[in-house]
UniProtKB/Swiss-Prot annotation:
Gene Ontology biological process: mitochondrial electron transport, ubiquinol to cytochrome c
Name of protein: Cytochrome b
Binding site for a ubiquinone: H201
Chain sites annotated for binding heme b b566: H97, H196
PROSITE patterns given in the database record: CYTB_CTER, CYTB_NTER
GO cellular component, one term: mitochondrial inner membrane
Pfam families from the UniProt entry: Cytochrom_B_C (PF00032), Cytochrome_B (PF00033)
């Protein structure tokens, strides 16, 4: 058995990635989220496959088919709610995973970090298209508002929007293509995950100290397989509590009304995991400016390795940078709250201040404070 594990071409890859992989001896529970994201992706693909067996991508029957899944299909309700709340868990793990990368300086592994950013964009695109599929009011108007943002692109904007719609409004053609993309993208994500891991295993994992751990490595199995299993059990527990006790907690009641192009909901808002970006978009009165701010709010992650001015990789021993990191976390929570509020006083002002603070913290304050810390440590 030992020989098969180490010599068989396929088993050898598995062995070197998950069993005999040399891992730092001191990585904390914050390093669990990579495997949890893998578990979330597997859950989404499996539940999504079963939903696709009963779903019809047609404007006249899409809403009814989702109701049919919940009412008539055996355990359809639990599959549907696992899929919907699984997306929330996916993004929760994703945000923590990125936050850990920022805090401990994992972004210095630039290839892994950049593939991660591409993964983030792909997951966001997949989630957006998935939200359109039940064809409720918020699905329809969310699709209309977000796709319409592309019309802000000079010269080609309008043509681009109509090309994506497949007509002059969000209609049957849009729903069909969104379903096709929503089905294929998770498999592209899975392929990108393998590339993400490939680059990670070229350098090895970072650790809380941010120093080389070559001198002290332990095998991934059994130490981190057991540790990851604990995280997985807690994630399953949290997901099941959400699915079985309050499955609609994170959803929008408007999505239980079938899509009606003649009736606009009073407050159009996306799912909670997009609210921070939506708040940044809304905080700029100009359409093109808002779209650019929206894109840059996520693309800013790509320039973080360039903005890293500290001599230490991790924030573990940098209290001033820690203060700014947690200020950024609080700022993102404020933006998330603002994104779900109506566009009126005082929410407009709070959103604008929070948006300015978001960019100021990342682009100016964090690099400056890192330089100050270097001076204080006489480095």
């Amino acid at each position: 058995m030992n020989n098969i594990r180490k010599n068989h071409p396929l088993m050898k890859i598995m062995n070197n990635s998950f069993i005999d992989l040399p891992a730092p001896s001191n990585i904390s529970s914050w390093w669990n989220f990579g495997s949890l994201l893998g578990a979330c992706l597997a859950l989404q693909i499996i539940t999504g496959l079963f939903l696709a067996m009963h779903y019809t991508a047609d404007t006249t029957t899409a809403f009814s088919s989702v109701a049919h899944i919940c009412r008539d299909v055996n355990y359809g309700w639990i599959i549907r709610y696992l899929h919907a709340n699984g997306a929330s868990m996916f993004f929760l793990c994703l945000f923590i995973h990125i936050g850990r990368g920022l805090y401990y300086g994992s972004f210095t592994l630039t290839e892994t970090w950049n593939i991660g950013i591409i993964l983030l964009f792909t997951v966001m695109a997949t989630a957006f298209m998935g939200y359109v599929l039940p064809w409720g009011q918020m699905s329809f108007w969310g699709a209309t508002v977000i796709t319409n943002l592309l019309s802000a692109i000079p010269y080609i904007g309008t043509n681009l929007v109509e090309w994506i719609w497949g007509g002059f409004s969000v209609d049957k053609a849009t729903l069909t293509r969104f379903f096709a993309f929503h089905f294929i993208l998770p498999f592209i994500i899975a392929a990108l995950v393998l590339v993400h891991l490939l680059f990670l295993h070229e350098t090895g994992s970072n650790n809380p100290l941010g120093i080389s751990s070559d001198s002290d490595k332990i095998p991934f199995h059994p130490y981190y397989t057991i540790k990851d299993l604990l995280g997985l059990l807690l994630l399953i527990l949290l997901t099941l509590i959400l699915v079985l006790f309050s499955p609609d907690l994170l959803g929008d009641p408007d999505n239980y009304t079938p899509a009606n192009p003649l009736n606009t909901p009073p407050h159009i808002k996306p799912e909670w995991y997009f609210l921070f970006a939506y708040a940044i978009l809304r905080s700029i009165p100009n359409k093109l400016g808002g779209v650019l701010a929206l894109i840059f709010s996520i693309l800013i992650l790509a320039i973080i390795p360039i903005l890293h001015t500290a001599k230490q990789r991790s924030m573990l021993f940098r209290p001033l940078s820690q203060c700014l990191f947690w200020t950024l976390t609080a700022d993102l929570l404020i933006l998330t709250w603002i994104g779900g509020q109506p566009v009126e006083h005082p929410f407009i002002t709070i959103g604008q201040v929070a948006s300015i603070l978001y960019f100021t913290l990342i682009l100016i304050l964090m690099p400056m404070v890192s330089l100050i810390e270097n001076k204080m440590l006489k480095w």
